[in-house]
């Protein structure tokens, strides 16, 4: 079993390393001391540089105090004052109906100033829209990497930086989640900005004045992928801060549980049922995000009801069929279920369920004789990816999946 755990750790390192090193940005000269240039393959430097992508894309009223770039400042501060009204042709306001606003005004606008605050978070890429699916994916993946390999961040002096980024992500997710007096989700803002408007004009975010409508999901139009992926990030955030800031960690976990409960108790629907995504980041499934969140919540709580939510939707065969990305979390799910299936927890305080595969076979009516191993599936997925089985490997080693955002898959 010890050897199996070591295999799992190596597979996690390979998967998360490929995801993290997607970005290449210019770095402030004064912040490069911990990343020496005198080695052929400087992974410490690659780790350091990759995090600065998020400084470049940070948004809101607290950019200046949290950012490591001198040329970045507060931007889209008016996201803190989105008029709490149905949007018109000018795209000012929200996608909420007037009746919904009237019913939940005290929750959406507790200070009664007529606005809803959805400031913070991160821009998507070169544009300035805050898209929920890639944002939640990035938040959970960065958090996962820090949780699994915290010592590496500390040894390279990147722990303070990544914690700043993780707090900024997850503070935004909590701000965008509106709870009633019972702690139940009333609404969740999954997007700020309109892709069509934003992509028609390119400028510095600090001087942007374009309309930035806020899009919410509610019980009347639930979107499982958004709330589940946000729940996963907040659950991981609990693990990352439970020993250093227990009150903040507990708050993150409360929000994670509330968001997952919303996903569980409402009709399962995709993000393309609403008016925000249009053709931008329309998810093709919700099951992967749902299982992703449930697996983390079981790992934290040991509550087997979360595993019961996984059994009907878990696709054991999916991981090698595509890459780990915002629209396909199955490789991540497989890794966490691999850890859950072990005899002993990977880290102190985690919960395991060694009989998971057998229980899944029973629930999914699989043959009891079929061999299933989560880590073997992950290994197959990495081999398939590295050999171009789900994309094209160029002569220089660049992995090309499709024309849109190809660098994200390298």
Annotate the PLM regions.
Residues 14-17, 230:
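Small side chains
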Residues 2-15:
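Bacterial N-terminal signal peptides that target proteins for export
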Residues 35-136, 140-410:
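Glycan-recognition and catalytic cores of secretory/periplasmic carbohydrate-active enzymes
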Residues 16-25:
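Hydrophobic core
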Residues 24-37:
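Sec-dependent signal peptide cleavage junction
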């Amino acid at each position: 079993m010890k050897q199996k755990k070591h295999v799992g750790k190596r597979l996690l390192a390979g998967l998360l390393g490929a995801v993290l090193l997607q970005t290449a940005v210019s770095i402030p000269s004064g912040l490069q001391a911990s990343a020496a240039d005198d080695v052929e393959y400087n992974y410490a430097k690659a780790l350091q540089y990759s995090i600065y992508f998020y400084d470049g894309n940070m948004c809101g009223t607290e950019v200046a105090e949290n950012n490591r770039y001198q040329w970045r400042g507060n931007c889209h501060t008016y996201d803190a004052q989105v008029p709490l009204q149905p949007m018109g042709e000018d795209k000012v306001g929200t996608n909420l109906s007037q009746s919904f606003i009237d019913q939940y005004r005290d929750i959406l606008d507790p200070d009664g100033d007529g606005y809803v605050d959805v400031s913070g978070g991160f821009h998507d890429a070169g544009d300035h829209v805050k898209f929920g699916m890639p944002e939640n994916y990035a938040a959970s993946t960065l958090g996962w990497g820090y949780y699994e390999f915290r010592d590496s961040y500390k040894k390279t002096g990147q722990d303070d930086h990544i914690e700043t980024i993780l707090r900024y992500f997850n503070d935004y997710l909590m701000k965008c989640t509106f709870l009633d007096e019972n702690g139940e989700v009333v609404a969740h803002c999954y997007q700020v900005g309109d892709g069509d408007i934003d992509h028609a004009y390119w400028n510095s975010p600090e001087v942007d004045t374009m309309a930035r409508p806020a899009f919410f999901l509610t019980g009347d139009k639930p979107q499982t992928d958004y709330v589940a992926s946000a729940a996963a990030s907040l659950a991981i955030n609990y693990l990352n801060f439970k020993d250093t800031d227990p009150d903040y960690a507990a708050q993150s976990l409360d929000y994670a549980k509330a968001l997952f409960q919303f996903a569980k108790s409402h009709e399962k629907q995709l993000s393309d049922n609403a008016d925000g995504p249009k053709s931008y980041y329309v998810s093709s499934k919700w099951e992967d995000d749902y299982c992703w969140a449930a697996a983390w919540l079981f790992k934290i709580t040991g509550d087997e009801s979360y595993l019961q939510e996984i059994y009907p939707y878990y696709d054991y065969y999916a991981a090698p069929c595509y890459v780990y990305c915002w629209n396909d979390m199955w490789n991540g799910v497989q890794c966490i279920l691999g850890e859950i299936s072990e005899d002993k927890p990977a880290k102190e305080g985690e919960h395991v369920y060694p009989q998971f595969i057998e229980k899944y076979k029973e629930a999914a009516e699989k043959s009891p004789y079929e061999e299933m191993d989560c880590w073997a599936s992950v290994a197959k997925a990495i081999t398939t990816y590295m050999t171009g089985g789900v994309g094209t490997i160029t002569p220089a080693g660049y992995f090309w999946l499709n024309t849109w955002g190809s660098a994200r898959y390298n």
